[in-house]
Amino acid sequence: LRNMDYSTIYDEIEKNHNYNVKLPDGGIIQLMYRFNRTGTELISHRLGYYPSPSYELYQNDPELYDVDYIYGDILNKSVLPVIIRADYNRDPEESELHHPYSHITLGGYKNCRIPVDRPISPMKFVKFIMEHFYYVPSSQLEFNFEIEGIVAFEEHIAEKDINKSRIIV
């Protein structure tokens, strides 16, 4: 899906059902993890948030969204939809030579890889999206955040990324 316009990327993900959650406004959340054969070690993850490239749902039923402050920013015409991806690969040969083991990419910018100090759990990623893109305070999310501590990953950051601006999970 490289070098394609955003709506084509979104349509391919949607058409192939390559996502875990489709939000009421059409936004898509993708959570993909790969573990070793015994399921005890994380090998890689690819987490993504793809905002809807169209406001067709809103145009067909604006009252549905107007009453809900959660969608205020999402439906603002001056807001540009931005893909958020969080990738992790424990393989030092692939990761250290080209990019940090764990990083966040904003938009489709090839060289935008913001180092993250460790892999990101599904709960933390979904919470991040809901709090920062939908204005849903965690106190209003109906998740059991106590289980958030069950899935915790060890710090895994390359020496050369420690002095860079980075995100600490």
Go through each PLM region and give its residues.
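Glutamate identity and glutamate-enriched acidic tracts
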Residues: 12-14, 41, 56, 63, ...
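Short N-terminal edge-element motif at the start of the domain
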Residues: 1-42
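Detector for Asparagine
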Residues: 3, 16-20, 36, 60, ...
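Generic ordered-secondary-structure signal
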Residues: 5-6, 41-42, 52, 81-83, ...
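An exposed acidic His-Trp-rich patch
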Residues: 37-121
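Generic structural motif recognizing short loop/turn segments at the entrances and edges of beta-strands
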Residues: 17, 25-27, 43-45, 78-84, ...
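Long, compositionally biased interface segments
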Residues: 113-169
